[in-house]
């Protein structure tokens, strides 16, 4: 069986996961700001060991292309390119916003862009419905108040339904603790 390695270092969180073609089998996510280049390969190996798979079992590496930390994005891309060259597997890059939406349903994906701004992407059935953009918190509140559909909200670390505007805005402003990443 072939697997996909998922890697995101575009924020203060290191995210590493392994999936088969249907679901994520194992994932880790924790704050590793300024240490991602030091710990990413160790965490990849830890997941391989936990799943009892070998690197040669990976046929695809899925990596974030941003938005996010430029240095962080370069870390993940360097790891992905190195592994792809050694293993002969392909690389797929996805928007950081797209990595956290499910393939079915309507999602608004929101990432903290700092300075009271948010990266926002809208997706339906896994496909973007509008181009990703950057909004201030006030613009985001206004935009969300005009929505008539009932999307799920995918923040950087969780898919959340029925979250209030204030809670969501507080979360992306860093006023609430981070919640666990889930696919």
Language-model region placement:
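Glycine/charged-rich beta-loop-alpha catalytic/anionic-binding loops adjacent to active sites
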Residues: 22-30, 57-64
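Charged catalytic carboxylate motif
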Residues: 39, 43
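Buried hydrophobic packing segments
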Residues: 44, 79-83, 101
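Phosphate-handling active-site elements
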Residues: 50-56, 85-94
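Phosphate/pyrophosphate-binding loops at sites that engage ATP/ADP/AMP, CoA/4′-phosphopantetheine
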Residues: 44-60, 142-144
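DPxDG-like acidic metal-binding loop motif
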Residues: 60-91
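Oxyanion-binding and handling regions
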Residues: 1-24, 31, 35-38, 53, ...
């Amino acid at each position: 069986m072939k697997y996909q390695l998922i890697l995101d270092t575009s924020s203060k969180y290191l995210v590493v996961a392994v999936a088969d073609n249907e679901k994520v089998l194992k994932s880790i996510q924790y704050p590793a700001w300024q240490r991602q280049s030091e710990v990413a390969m160790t965490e990849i190996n830890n997941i391989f060991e936990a799943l009892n798979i070998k690197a040669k079992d990976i046929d695809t590496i899925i990596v974030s292309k941003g938005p996010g930390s430029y240095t962080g994005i370069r870390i993940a891309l360097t790891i992905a390119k190195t592994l792809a060259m050694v293993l002969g597997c392909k690389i797929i890059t996805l928007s950081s916003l797209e990595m956290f939406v499910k393939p079915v349903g309507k999602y608004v994906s929101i990432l903290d862009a700092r300075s009271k701004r948010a990266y926002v992407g809208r997706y339906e059935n896994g496909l973007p419905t509008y181009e990703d953009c950057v909004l201030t918190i006030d613009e985001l509140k206004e935009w969300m108040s005009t929505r008539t559909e009932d999307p799920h909200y995918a923040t950087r670390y969780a898919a959340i339904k029925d979250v209030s505007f204030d809670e969501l805005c507080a979360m992306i402003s860093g006023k609430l603790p981070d919640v666990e990443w889930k696919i």
